[in-house]
């Protein structure tokens, strides 16, 4: 009985691990699309045309306490200063996807 339970758990974990990259890729692809249509005008290539020091580059996100999905989601939902709020314009899923995309790009240095 114990062996069977361990086998079932091992199979379940293997399935979850194998599915994660595909799900993440789909989120990043949607995040890229949402970013392109809603964010790129001000944040092309991870920059910031309004406030040059507050970019989406990893170092700036870390410096300003924004290097987490939760922080980016809050900022996108509520806006700040010249950045408009996107809650109501974008779905929660779109906002989550764009946050994941921003973090992914920041980790890659916005190299693509």
Swiss-Prot record:
Any one GO cellular component localisation term in the record: plasma membrane-derived thylakoid lumen
- Spell out the disulfide connections: none
Which InterPro entries does the record cross-reference, listed alphabetically? Cyt_c-like_dom, Cyt_c-like_dom_sf, Cyt_C6, Cyt_C_IC
- One GO BP: photosynthesis
Is the keyword Signal assigned to this protein? yes
Q: Which Pfam families match?
A: Cytochrome_CBB3 (PF13442)
Does the keyword Membrane belong to this entry? no
Q: Which UniProt keywords apply?
A: Electron transport, Heme, Iron, Metal-binding, Photosynthesis, Signal, Thylakoid, Transport
Record's subunit section: Monomer.
Identify its protein family. Belongs to the cytochrome c family. PetJ subfamily.
In Swiss-Prot or TrEMBL terms, this protein is called: Cytochrome c6
Look up and give the organism this protein is from. Answer: Thermosynechococcus vestitus (strain NIES-2133 / IAM M-273 / BP-1)
Its lineage reads: Bacteria, Bacillati, Cyanobacteriota, Cyanophyceae, Acaryochloridales
């Amino acid at each position: 009985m114990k062996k069977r339970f361990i086998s079932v758990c091992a199979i379940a974990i293997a399935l979850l691990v194998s599915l994660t990259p595909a799900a993440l890729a789909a989120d990043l692809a949607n995040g890229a699309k949402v970013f392109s249509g809603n964010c790129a005008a001000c944040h092309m290539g991870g920059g910031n045309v309004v406030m040059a020091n507050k970019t989406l580059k990893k170092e700036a996100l870390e410096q300003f306490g924004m290097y987490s999905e939760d922080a980016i989601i809050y900022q996108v939902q509520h806006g700040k200063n010249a950045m408009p709020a996107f809650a109501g314009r974008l779905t929660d899923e779109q906002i989550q996807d764009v946050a994941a995309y921003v973090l992914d790009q920041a980790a890659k240095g916005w190299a693509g």
